[in-house]
Amino acid sequence: MKMPRSGLGAGLLFLLPAVTILSGVDGMAKYLTEVGYSVLQIVWARYLFQTILTFPLAWSRHGTGLLRPPDVWAQVGRSLLHATSTFLIFLAFARMPLADAIAIFFAYPFLVTAMAPWLLGETTGWRRWLACIIGFGGTLFIIKPDFGAFDAGALMALAGSVAFAFYIVLTRRVALRAEPAMAIFIQGLIAAILLSFVVAWSWRTPDLSAW
């Protein structure tokens, strides 16, 4: 399967603001771990707000069709992979500098590029590999991580990167049938529901600064 060139430019335009927003989420997660909130509670809140914020758009487009999403098990799988990845990288944030954790996590483009021919049937030429290398090098140059000690936090960041790579691959498959607003809403809903069963064990009522 080959990505249509007409969609590449639009994809990049959506990618840039998405990366900016996610960088803000990472910074807030790091702050919340530093002031004493558990990673489990932070991850739960992240998906709860995702569900609330995406529901109006998803409902306006699909209505009761949200109860019948396509590729249900693929939707569940991508939600579990994303929640696992988020949990692991937030754990890494709690144990190491933010820049170091993000630098390790950004190994995922290499993993996605390596898996794409086998799992998606997409062509992976030398230009894409070169783009990955240049992009990763640019990331390291900007954030200047310190890899003095590759500890448990670093392993969590790496494991999170692997989970996120599989999430990206599965999302590519789901995107062929599921409309984006529905897919994002379903992803947040599944994760929020599952985490609701365990978040009480590490609950701390948020104060004004946390909100």
Language-model regions, residue ranges each:
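Loop-to-transmembrane-helix transition segments
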Residues: 10-18, 58-88, 152-160, 207-211
